[in-house]
């Protein structure tokens, strides 16, 4: 018995010693059943793209893990008008953007500009990023967002007002889906200038 305890203690000490020598990873390694087409769920409707992008991006609202219950995401709260046609999103403060890709160094946190960028690129034909996919955003269109949206406005840096042409019962669940991923407008602006 004493020998077993001694061996166990030695093993535990060795494991602890190995743990303190951890090295900062330089590359993210992700295992998937296939290669994603890209990391922009707005452009694709495949599981490999969604699976690769989900750990990287968030939506305004999201599904609670393993359910279809809508919970706060990048919007910490929201209010739906009595007629169901206006949704006011209060955005989470202090959310940081990723850096390093194409030497991008964000100068600001997530805000309403990113929400407008992410939806308008799919919705507005005159948006500079709309044509990237040939103007086709199948998921966005399949959720009938182009015909449902009346306007999307920035009230202030942390408030976005979405107006619908008519009330839509599943709108919050729909916004939890992958096409609703929010991306950095600042990063997109940097790419346009490159």
Which residues does each PLM region occupy?
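Surface-exposed binding/hinge segments that line
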Residues: 109, 114-116, 123-193
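Sec/Tat signal peptide C-region and signal peptidase I cleavage site
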Residues: 18-25
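N-terminal lobe/hinge region of extracytoplasmic solute-binding protein
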Residues: 31-82, 120, 127
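Bacterial N-terminal signal peptides that target proteins for export
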Residues: 1-10
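Solvent-exposed coil/turn segments that connect beta secondary-structure elements
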Residues: 33-36, 44, 65-66, 83-85, ...
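Aromatic- and charge-enriched surface segment that lines or borders ligand/interaction sites
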Residues: 76-129, 161
């Amino acid at each position: 018995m004493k020998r077993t305890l001694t061996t166990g203690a030695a093993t535990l000490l060795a494991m602890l010693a190995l743990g303190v020598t951890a090295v900062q990873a330089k590359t993210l390694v992700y295992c998937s059943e296939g290669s994603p087409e890209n990391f922009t769920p707005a452009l694709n409707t495949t599981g490999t793209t969604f699976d690769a992008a989900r750990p990287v991006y968030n939506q305004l609202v999201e599904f609670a893990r393993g359910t279809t219950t809508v919970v706060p995401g990048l919007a910490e709260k929201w209010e739906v008008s009595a007629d169901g046609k206006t949704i006011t999103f209060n955005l989470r403060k202090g959310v940081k953007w990723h850096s390093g890709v194409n030497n991008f160094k964000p100068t600001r946190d997530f805000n309403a500009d990113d929400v407008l960028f992410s939806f308008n690129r799919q919705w507005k034909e005159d948006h500079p990023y709309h044509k990237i996919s040939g103007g086709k955003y199948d998921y966005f269109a399949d959720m009938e967002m182009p015909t449902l949206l009346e306007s999307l406005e920035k009230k202030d840096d942390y408030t976005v007002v979405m107006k619908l042409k008519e009330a839509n019962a599943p709108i919050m669940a729909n916004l939890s889906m992958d096409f609703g991923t929010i991306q950095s407008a600042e990063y997109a602006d940097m790419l346009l200038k490159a």
